[in-house]
Regions:
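Membrane translocator/pore-forming domains, dominated by Gram-negative outer-membrane beta-barrels
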Residues: 1-209
């Protein structure tokens, strides 16, 4: 939904559904033998997003979201009796705020320069593996992302975009206890660089999304 004002600014908002999946591998050793674990993650959720843009292309945006995250890992651990896997399911909650500016490059393309801050909280879970209890603590993620994105073919319903961004994770610590004994903390804290290429479908020229 979008509302345009007499001063040339625009406010838009909407509700959304989100879904994603990914795969990963772990590498461990037991009794001088190395073994690989294969994992997968799936999340489903939804939320609400809003954005305000003035006539000069400067905008602010924000969102709230919540959902469920499922994680499955095969061959996660091994002992003399064989290998073991586990499954976890946790709720997640998140929010983000952002600011940016849209710069017109031509009639059919523009440049989006932005900065965004993301906060996500994922609840912990407990599993039993081979009779032993493992407790996974909750995880808090705080990320700052700055980047730029170019969108071309804006005059068409299908436009293309590509961009680069730098991201820094301020938190991301993951703690676990096994039978009451605390394991070493695993952390995602640090810098990363990302690139993106994609397509966007805009059903009408006046659509805000």
């Amino acid at each position: 939904n979008a509302d345009k004002f007499d001063n040339g600014s625009e406010f838009s908002w909407g509700v959304f559904y989100e879904n994603g999946s990914g795969n990963y591998r772990t590498y461990n050793s037991f009794n001088n033998e190395f073994f690989r674990g294969d994992g997968s993650m799936v999340y489903n959720g939804g939320g609400i997003a809003a954005r305000y843009e003035n006539k000069n292309g400067v905008y602010t945006e924000g969102s709230l979201r919540a959902g469920m995250l499922k994680n499955e890992l095969d061959n996660a651990m091994r002992d003399v009796n064989g290998s073991y896997g586990y499954e976890t399911e946790s709720a997640y909650y998140g929010a983000h705020i952002g600011v940016g500016k849209i710069i017109s490059l031509s009639d059919s393309s523009d440049l989006d320069i932005y900065g965004k801050f993301f906060h996500t909280y994922t609840e912990g879970d407990s599993v039993t593996i081979a009779g032993d209890k493992f407790d996974f603590d909750s995880i808090t993620s705080d990320r700052l992302r700055v980047g730029a994105r170019i969108t071309s073919n804006k005059e068409n319903k299908f436009s293309t975009y590509y961009g680069l961004a730098y991201e820094y994770e301020f938190n991301g610590d993951a703690d676990m206890t096994a039978q009451g004994l605390r394991a070493d903390t695993q952390s995602l804290q640090g810098s990363s660089v990302m690139a993106e290429v994609g397509f966007n479908y805009q059903p009408t020229p006046d659509s805000p999304w």
